[in-house]
Amino acid sequence: MVKERRTELVQGFRHSVPYINTHRGKTFVIMLGGEAIEHENFSSIVNDIGLLHSLGIRLVVVYGARPQIDANLAAHHHEPIYHKHTRVTDAKTLELVKQAAGLLQLDITARLSMSLNNTPLQGAHINVVSGNFIISQPLGVDDGVDYCHSGRIRRIDEEAIHRQLDSGAIVLMGPVAVSVTGESFNLTSEEVATQLAIKLKAEKMIGFCSSQGVFDEQGNIVSELFPNEAQARVETLEAEGDYHSGTVRFLRGAVKACRSGVRRSHLISYQEDGALLQELFSRDGIGTQIVMESAEQIRRATINDIGGILELIRPLEQQGILVRRSREQLEMEIDKFTIIQRDNLTIACAALYPFPEEKIGEMACVAVHPDYRSSSRGEVLLERVAAQARQIGLSKLFVLTTRSIHWFQERGFTPVDIDSLPESKKEMYNYQRRSKVLMADLG
């Protein structure tokens, strides 16, 4: 048992090291809604933020205060007013907003300052800086309704923020900002986080919600969404009456951020202990990413991919599932291979060997990394190889397999005799291996 834990620790560390190096020196904007701050797991989140800082990541933390503001309004018997799902901040509300936001700022600053206590990094000092880095302006009047002290961002002093980040500080920003006239305005945390991420050219924007991310109809976490897909989710949630949940607020901001140059926005749960670390330091993460370009790419292989392909297929060759290929053979045939890569790891491959005279192609060397065999990568490869075969005028595709007969049959392949093979392939057929021949029409 102890040995298994040690092995798991070593493997986890090996997998995380590339991400530690990748993230060092990058700017992340972390959005903490008021719901996350109220949750019992908040102390762990703060500790993990302190850990990110110790790894050399430049952090801007944006906090919201919606539930705290609502509680403060209720305690003072002041009814909240909304117009078009935006809070109307009258003078009384503004005072209560400033109270709630000010208390949170002090509390979060104190927690971040002591976040590395009771860890091996105890004694390391974290500077937390807040300031008038954002200048606001009023939302104004809409349909005869004056939003009063509800505002929007007018400009951001990104140079001043960068100076603080360069000095090693964590920058903490809340939902209240001043204007050029000295007035205070109530902003939404998603606007603050989104505009900061855009202006600072942040590598990532990270948000917390009550669930683990976005789910599909089967209840599975959707690991990646493109901006148009995320926007569709927002519209669906709003149609269901959800305008203020952590999920919908973050997705709105993530769509804007992604379209404005922020490479990845991550939505994770504030209820899951260690979700921040799992999302940032593992290949598959734990939540949902909004991305312009997928972390997973399917493409033709090049000579630089030989090492990754060999690492993927060697275990299957040793088990007798695949026919052994030497490095030299792979080098000569690399143009026939298609691979799927995830964060520079080759997780699947397949090759297409055409027989132009017979208008038949062979799909061979199909391999999927053990961690991804329960997913649809095999089908993705099959579709890509079939498309490549059609493009070069082939009408049929065959496979030789000893283990995956049913998998191919479920996808339109039927068993055929060896005589159905192209003549040159038939001459090389290994009668000792006794592979089954399955063929599919590409029409």
UniProtKB/Swiss-Prot annotation:
Q: GO: which molecular function terms? A: L-glutamate N-acetyltransferase activity
Q: What is its main location?
A: cytoplasm
Q: In which pathway does it act?
A: Amino-acid biosynthesis; L-arginine biosynthesis; N(2)-acetyl-L-ornithine from L-glutamate: step 1/4
What organism does the record attribute this protein to?
Answer: Enterobacter sp. (strain 638)
Q: Which HAMAP family match?
A: N_acetyl_glu_synth
Give the family, as the similarity comment puts it. Belongs to the acetyltransferase family. ArgA subfamily.
Q: Single GO cellular component annotation?
A: cytoplasm
Q: Which reaction does it catalyse?
A: L-glutamate + acetyl-CoA = N-acetyl-L-glutamate + CoA + H(+)
What's the EC number here? Answer: 2.3.1.1
Which stretches make up the N-acetyltransferase domain?
296-435
Q: What is this protein called?
A: Amino-acid acetyltransferase
Q: Does the keyword Magnesium apply?
A: no
The family database entries (Pfam families) matched by this protein are listed as: AA_kinase, Acetyltransf_1
Family annotation (NCBIfam families): N-Ac-Glu-synth, PRK05279.1
Q: Where in the cell is it found?
A: Cytoplasm
Keyword annotations of the record: Acyltransferase, Amino-acid biosynthesis, Arginine biosynthesis, Cytoplasm, Transferase
Q: How does it assemble?
A: Homohexamer.
Gene Ontology terms: biological process: L-arginine biosynthetic process
